[in-house]
Design a protein with these regions (language model features):
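Membrane-entry segments of alpha-helical transmembrane domains in multi-pass membrane proteins
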Residues: 47-58, 100-112
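Transmembrane helix-loop-helix hairpins at membrane boundaries of multipass inner-membrane proteins
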Residues: 1-89, 176, 457-463
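Alpha-helical transmembrane segments
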Residues: 14-24, 60, 92-96, 195-197, ...
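Hydrophobic transmembrane alpha-helices and their helix-loop junctions in integral membrane proteins
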Residues: 65-74, 96-108, 120-377, 381-412
Length: 466
């Protein structure tokens, strides 16, 4: 249905505010790079270092792109006024909670914020009000709530260990205080705490075998929400794991590294081989997210170079996957199906959308000149340099499987005859321009890694080293 003028004004106002948020995130990145200390406020309760600034930039950037492509932004998008209103309220709350999670120094507030992302996003998933979307929302809510409860148990264990060794200290739940006390904490208890934390936040991050909610939720949610969940929500959950790894590494040496490596390899195997049998393109993109979050987890276990590759991969994946899901939403609106077999002749029916969707998928399989090729190459190199050549071999095998599967599915969608009843042609509007800009970003990150980005990634790695 056509969107009222008032709704479009509100929509573009939201986009403008998101542009301001992106500018603020860029300022934070610059302040972290140019300053001698992290940006702090409220006596250290809010603390933005390089890692926080990097995630904040990803969150605001993806949210801004999603806002341009959101319901109520013009034309006939199939949403009524009530759906548009609910989407805007809860998506903005969702983005706010992600920002709170990565900018607070308090592990308790971070836990609350990540739990709040579950609630705010679960309301948006069934926006289409279909049986499948409602079921996916409940599945997501229940599984992730159990995971968050386990993360809470791990947080409580770590806090009790801290109190038993350091006593009652102001700001005891702040990262800086925990890291300072970590060498004197009990290794056995911290191992148990991190196991709970990894399973808990790993559920939210989509790490296998806790990933079972992800394909349903990402495939049933509206395209902008799918883009935000896959592009940055998984990264926020990994942020929590990485922060705790920085504490546990000072207490229990290589325990966290080994767990992350195991979880990453399992996720990579499950994600890549699941791509072979997919029949729906949104579920295909969802399982691709499991694969890529596995690569990030592996990189975090491969020393400084691996961590650099992992954070670069998070950035690349945020851009590529959000772009892919937003384009998938355009395809769904035109073809009225998510079945790969029923989407043919995409390049003829939607030349711009088809070309950009092809670029997004080629980026996700790690082909040059896109940025994911660089991060995956660095990850494999890190595995070899750390003496884990078998890890490099497994990664290359899984990347090959993912490449063949995704290219096969993509070819079936791009070519062939346009189905009867599908309109041919599309207008070039702001949405296409915005998505094309995402492709440009991926090419820039693949050809020439800008010096400020490289410096921010280096600073991010140094924040987490013992």
């Amino acid at each position: 249905m056509l969107v009222p003028r008032r709704a479009r004004v509100v929509g573009w106002s939201t986009v403008l505010l998101n542009v301001v948020s992106v500018a603020d995130s860029v300022w934070l990145c610059g302040a972290v790079l140019l300053g001698d200390a992290p940006v702090t406020a409220a006596q250290g309760f809010w603390r933005v270092d390089a890692l926080s600034a990097l995630l904040a930039l990803c969150i605001t950037g993806v949210t801004c792109v999603a806002a341009v492509c959101a319901p109520g932004m013009g034309g006939s998008d199939g949403y009524d006024a009530r759906q548009v209103r609910r989407f805007r309220i809860f998506v903005n709350a969702f983005a706010l909670m992600m920002l709170v999670a990565v900018t607070t120094s308090n592990v308790g507030i971070m836990w609350v914020a990540i739990e709040a992302t579950t609630i705010t996003s679960a309301v948006v998933i069934p926006l289409h009000r279909t049986r499948a979307s409602v079921e996916a929302s409940w599945k997501y809510l229940l599984i992730c709530s159990v995971g968050i409860a386990l993360a809470f148990a791990g947080t409580v264990l770590a806090y009790f260990d801290f109190v038993s060794t350091a006593g009652q200290v102001p700001n005891a739940l702040n990262w800086t205080v925990l890291r300072a006390a970590a060498p004197s904490m009990h290794p056995e208890l911290m191992r148990l705490a991190f196991a709970f934390i990894l399973v808990g936040y790993g559920t939210k991050a989509g790490l296998a075998p806790m990933h079972t909610w992800l394909p349903d939720a990402h495939s049933e949610a509206p395209a902008p929400m799918s883009a935000m969940m896959s592009g940055v929500l998984l990264a926020v959950a990994m942020y929590a794991i990485v922060r705790w790894k920085g504490v546990v590494d000072l207490t229990a040496a290589s325990f966290a590294t080994n767990l992350l490596l195991a979880a990453g390899l399992l996720s990579l195997l499950v994600g890549s081989f699941s791509l072979v049998i997919q029949r729906r393109y949104k579920r295909m993109l969802a399982y691709s997210s499991v694969e890529h979050i596995g690569l990030v987890s592996i990189g975090l276990a491969l020393g400084p170079l691996g961590m650099f590759a992992a954070f670069l991969h998070l950035v690349n994946h945020a851009v590529a996957k959000s772009m892919a899901f937003l384009l998938a939403g355009r395809i769904l609106h035109r073809y009225d199906t998510t079945e790969i077999a029923r989407v043919t002749g995409l390049l003829r029916a939607m030349p711009w959308t088809g070309s950009l969707f092809a670029a997004a998928v080629l980026a996700l399989v790690g082909l040059p000149p896109f940025g994911l090729f660089v991060s995956e190459f660095l990850l494999v190199r890190a595995a070899v340099l750390t003496g884990r050549t078998w890890v490099a071999a497994v990664v290359l095998l899984c990347l090959l499987v993912a490449f063949v599967s995704l290219i096969n599915h993509l070819n079936r969608m791009l070519y062939g005859a346009v189905p009867e009843g599908v309109k041919v042609g599309e207008a070039r509007g702001w949405k296409i321009v915005t998505l094309a800009a995402c492709a440009v970003v991926l090419v820039v990150l693949g050809l020439v890694l800008p010096r400020p980005v490289s410096a921010l990634l280096d600073r991010t790695v140094s924040v987490l080293l013992p």
